[in-house]
Amino acid sequence: MVLPKRLHLLLSGIIVILAGMVYGGYPEVWMPLVLDFRVESLELSNMLRAVMGIYMGIGVFWIIGSYKTHFWRAATLSNVLFMGGISFGRIISTLFDGVSVCFTPALILEILFFLWGFYNLKFNKNL
């Protein structure tokens, strides 16, 4: 089965934008529901909204890269680095802190997107 070369950017871009919206869009509402902790300080709200901005910015770049051939390689490389880095962090957390029921599915998806992007970089040099 051959997957389209650009689909990984489109899918991961949409997922990361949605994750960013969960982190930063009304963190005082979403964080207790999703992650079981309260956001009670201005600093924590600011940090979560900054994370939202990073996620939304990189997600938009990946979506642009999925449509614009000129940006495909840079977007795919940034996707591989992001997914590889976040996977590495979650693996370290799993080893030191234990298995997270909430984030294990995210870890699996991040590893899959990392491998898919790496594969695309290796075998699609003509883009």
Predicted regions located by residue number:
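Hydrophobic transmembrane helix segments
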Residues: I15-N46, M52
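Non-cytosolic membrane-interface motifs at loop->transmembrane helix junctions
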Residues: R38-V39, V99-L109
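Core segments of alpha-helical transmembrane spans in multipass integral membrane proteins
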Residues: E43-I64, L81-G85
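Juxtamembrane helix-break-helix junctions at the cytosolic face
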Residues: V60-A74
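Membrane-helix boundary connector in multi-pass membrane proteins
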Residues: V80, F88-T104, K122-F123
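Membrane-water interface at the C-terminal end of transmembrane alpha helices
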Residues: L112-L127
